[in-house]
């Protein structure tokens, strides 16, 4: 909800969410800026955000809560993490991925969702890229899909954000999070082609410069009346 951007732009997290919403693929939290008072004391601008849980997935994907497996970070929390870890193990064991291995992976995860997630993380330069949420539902195709989450430490110059996400040593704060999934997928020519196609689409549409600047003006315009306070 922008907690680590509170003394700066205040709106980096919601900017990225609002832009990514236009992909039509990535799940992300709706938001609303509010002015907070506690016992009559003015606490400034805050954001009301949807909470990411099984109910969030159920409402956004039109499935039941009981059908949802929601994972956090490296699959260490949530039902179904064993299956995700098995998928990672398969990718590691079969890299470089040939056509058959890539089809196996595609049967278990939405690779377009993952590509759009990576492109969004790279575009905004998310320093906290290890803070991840992803899910699947047994009422759909049971494929893993990614949720855009926690993008308030973003838009800083001076870093190679592409390498930050694919570095075999790890990504995220302290490089504590594995890059095995993306590194394994990048060994597939089919995934690289998909990634380039999604990159082209998103740079020409989702993150088109005039659109991003207009969105910044729109969001900042909502905050300006409160900034002086």
Model-derived features with residue positions:
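Acidic, His- and aromatic-enriched active-site or binding-groove loops in soluble protein domains
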Residues: 48-73
């Amino acid at each position: 909800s922008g907690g680590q951007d509170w003394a700066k732009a205040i709106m980096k997290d919601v900017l990225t969410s609002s832009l990514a919403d236009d992909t039509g693929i990535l799940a992300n939290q709706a938001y609303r800026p509010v002015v907070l008072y506690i016992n009559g004391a003015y606490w400034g601008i805050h954001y009301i955000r949807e909470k990411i849980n099984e109910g969030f997935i159920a409402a956004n994907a039109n499935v039941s809560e009981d059908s949802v497996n929601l994972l956090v970070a490296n699959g260490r929390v949530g039902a179904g993490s064993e299956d995700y870890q098995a998928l990672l193990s398969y990718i590691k064991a079969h890299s470089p991925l040939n056509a058959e291995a890539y089809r196996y992976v595609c049967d278990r995860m939405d690779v377009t969702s993952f590509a759009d997630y990576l492109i969004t993380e790279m575009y905004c330069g998310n320093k906290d890229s290890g803070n991840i949420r992803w899910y699947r539902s047994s009422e759909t195709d049971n494929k893993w899909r990614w949720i855009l989450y926690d993008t308030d430490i973003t838009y800083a110059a001076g870093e190679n954000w592409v390498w930050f996400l694919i570095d075999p040593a790890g990504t995220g704060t302290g490089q504590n999070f594995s890059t095995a999934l993306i590194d394994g997928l990048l060994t597939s020519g089919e995934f690289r082609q998909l990634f380039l196609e999604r990159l082209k689409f998103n740079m020409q549409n989702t993150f088109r410069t005039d659109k991003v600047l207009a969105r910044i003006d729109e969001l900042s315009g909502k905050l300006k009346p409160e900034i002086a306070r």
